[in-house]
Amino acid sequence: MPLDLTTPKPLLSAEREAMRLGAGAPDSYAGAFEAVYAAAWLPVFRLALAWTNDWSAAEDLAQEAFLRLWDRRAEVDWSLPVLPWLLVTTRRTATDRFRRLRRALAVRGPIEVVPGSDARIEWLDLRASFRALSALERSALVLTALEDLDAAQAGEILGIAANAVRSAASRGRRKLKEQR
């Protein structure tokens, strides 16, 4: 059965379920974690997919974010929403991986792109344009345009004001339009 990337699962009900399970007690971590995982996996995966444009790499990033949540389960305040922490963790992990990849490519040299269909070339151009944006502009666009978060929610995840998110997303859209 194909994965439906368009229908987010209800986050609030899962987080309420996690609290109902008595997530503060050590024997309920698994139940709380399962509830949060069921609700938050799709948004975390979509953010990772937007960053990597690679299904397998996105799965790895999402799993790493949840693994870090599990490793810190005793420190988590399960009465608060966990999704913002997961999204920040995913973004930071993706950024770290891109830095390592950039260093590795600098050592090895540029990769040759074999021309393909026009759609493939357009996609590569869009990816190059997207990568030319600053990390803040990329993050603001991914969170507001792809994840459909409002500026305040995106600002909380990025650690900046809502106005800064709106400004960064606007700059990013303008730069993408200019490069078309």
Provide a role label for each language-model segment.
Residues 5-17, 96, 103-128, 150:
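Internal acidic/polar
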Residues 120, 130-138:
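Short helix-coil-helix linker/hinge
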Residues 91, 95, 158-180:
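DNA-recognition helix of helix-turn-helix
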Residues 140-144:
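A short pre-motif secondary-structure segment
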Residues 46, 60-67, 71, 80-92:
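Structural recognition of an alpha-helix C-terminal capping motif at a helix-to-coil junction
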Residues 19-25, 35, 125-133:
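Short amphipathic alpha-helical boundary/capping segments
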Residues 71-78, 88-109, 119:
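Arg/Lys-rich amphipathic alpha helix in sigma70-family domain 2
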Residues 22-46, 56-59, 70:
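A short, charge-rich alpha-helical start-of-domain segment used by transcription regulators
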